[in-house]
């Protein structure tokens, strides 16, 4: 899946919309979770969902952080390494 820039409701902004990059599906035990995705917000990886009833993404960039302990980190870490020089 090619990364796509989307408008999403961000938890850190109390649900207001902001910019996020949809990277691909969220995996659990090497299987994709239905309707759960990994996003890049700023220079961090986060989880989020698509609300199909309203057609909008909701990203948890407060508590849904994907770090080194998460299996998704190894899959998507290249996207945070690309822009680690501050040009996001």
Regions found by a protein language model. Give the residues of each.
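SH3-family beta-barrel domains
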Residues: 3-12
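Acidic, low-complexity, intrinsically disordered interaction modules
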Residues: 18-73
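Short intrinsically disordered terminal tails
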Residues: 1-2, 78-88
């Amino acid at each position: 899946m090619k990364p796509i820039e989307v408008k999403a409701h961000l938890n850190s902004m109390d649900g207001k919309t902001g910019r996020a990059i949809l990277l691909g599906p969220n995996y659990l035990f090497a299987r994709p979770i239905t309707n759960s995705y990994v996003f890049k917000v700023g220079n961090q990886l986060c989880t989020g969902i698509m609300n199909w009833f309203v057609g909008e993404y909701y990203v948890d960039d407060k508590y849904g952080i994907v770090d080194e302990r998460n299996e998704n980190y190894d899959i998507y870490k290249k996207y945070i390494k690309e822009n680690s020089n501050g040009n996001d």
